[in-house]
Amino acid sequence: MTTVDIGRYKRLVQYFWDPEPTNNIASKSPIWCLGEEYLVSDKSSPSAVTESPPKEGGYLLAQSLSTTETTTPPDSTVGSLESSSEYDNCDTASTDGGWPTAFLDDFEAKIWLTYRSNFPAIAKSQDPKALSAMSLSVRLRSQLVDQGGFTSDTGWGCMIRSGQSLLANALLTLRMGREWRRGSSSNEERKILSLFADDPRAPYSIHKFVEHGASACGKHPGEWFGPSAAARCIQALTNSQVESELRVYITGDGSDVYEDTFMSIAKPNSTKFTPTLILVGTRLGLDKITPVYWEALKSSLQMPQSVGIAGGRPSSSHYFIGVQESDFFYLDPHQTRPALPFNDNVEDYTPEDIDSCHTRRLRRLHIKEMDPSMLIAFLIRDENDWKDWRRAVREVQGKGVIHVADRDPALHGLGAERDGAIDEVETFDDDDDDTVLNG
């Protein structure tokens, strides 16, 4: 008897007809977005929301004054239609699908950086190995279309874009506060976006990521990045900024965070504490996230210091910023838009330029469908923040994905790993992660 692949037909139907998801969690579970909690009302109105009481160290909730509408082409979602959902922006509250309006406003306020096209060319590598490191589609495009260099990162830049989004939102929180929503402080937002313009003059442009990836991470232009390479680029590019307002601590090939090393970056020579971005590169299983880590991973997005998760999607990378029960909400970089220009005068950015960096469309993915290779980020603003975060990491339910210790054994000549480290979180190297996190 012939076996019928029902899933194949389901994906085909969803390719042409993908209904809007609704907030149909029977328990009316709260929704979390980078440390902010949104409670769902039991009232009949699908858009009604009950705001949670202030949390210790929490932030005020706000609503935006504007919305944007975006469209993702079918070719960027066909591989995930069965397990992901989309939400199209609508102007009326009655069509919000049961999602709290305050949550949608918060989601929309996050900076969303995607594939871009028609930017100044990124020169190809002359290394004979560079061509074989590209995917077949990128290789063909480079030979037939981008013969003079890469003018688009479509097909290979998704991890870079996820990393850019993560860094941009860390800067957004640092400069404008967690409570910021669209419709205010537009010039300050433009200043942040200009840092990520698709131009080699912008300090956090894709050109700069590719340049450092080639020189320090062994990544050729047009080659997929993994979380490890993205973290190293974020750290290097941030450190290259004179009088940077932000510092970056990366865990390297492990999930252990050491206080002495962290403080040497955030507060060198016992000087004033500088806000520091912690980037934890980890792999929480082989092909799927091991269930024992589920609760701890959910908790990472509930902490006030959370800046999200980059990676974590089979065959691609996304930027995860929210969670409800076991569903994770994310911003998808797999949509090609015109290049974001570099402007010396930030007032020259048009409303269309700004709108292209935001979306009100929700996408969600069950944790069992997520790829285990990822970059988890936290913004530590001061020493009290550090103490709160360290306590929260220690108190998570389930098996922890992050471990904090007082001293780095390598710095003190101890030469010993933390007990049980080998048996816990599986880490990755660049050869590993890039096989699963492609653009």
From Swiss-Prot:
It is an enzyme of class 3 (hydrolase). The keyword Repeat does not apply. Residues 65-91 are annotated as: Disordered. Residues 66-77 have a biased composition (Low complexity). InterPro entries: Papain-like_cys_pep_sf (IPR038765), Peptidase_C54 (IPR005078), Peptidase_C54_cat (IPR046792). Keywords: Autophagy, Cytoplasm, Hydrolase, Nucleus, Protease, Protein transport, Thiol protease, Transport. Its EC number is 3.4.22.-. The active site is at C158, D332, H334. GO terms for molecular function: cysteine-type endopeptidase activity; protein-phosphatidylethanolamide deconjugating activity. One of its GO terms (cellular component) is phagophore assembly site. Residues 78-91 have a biased composition (Polar residues). It is found in: Cytoplasm; Nucleus; Preautophagosomal structure. One of its GO terms (biological process) is protein processing. It catalyses: [protein]-C-terminal L-amino acid-glycyl-phosphatidylethanolamide + H2O = [protein]-C-terminal L-amino acid-glycine + a 1,2-diacyl-sn-glycero-3-phosphoethanolamine. It holds the Pfam family Peptidase_C54. Cysteine protease that plays a key role in cytoplasm to vacuole transport (Cvt) and autophagy by mediating both proteolytic activation and delipidation of ATG8. Required for selective autophagic degradation of the nucleus (nucleophagy) as well as for mitophagy which contributes to regulate mitochondrial quantity and quality by eliminating the mitochondria to a basal level to fulfill cellular energy requirements and preventing excess ROS production. The protease activity is required for proteolytic activation of ATG8: cleaves the C-terminal amino acid of ATG8 to reveal a C-terminal glycine. Belongs to the peptidase C54 family. This is Probable cysteine protease atg4.
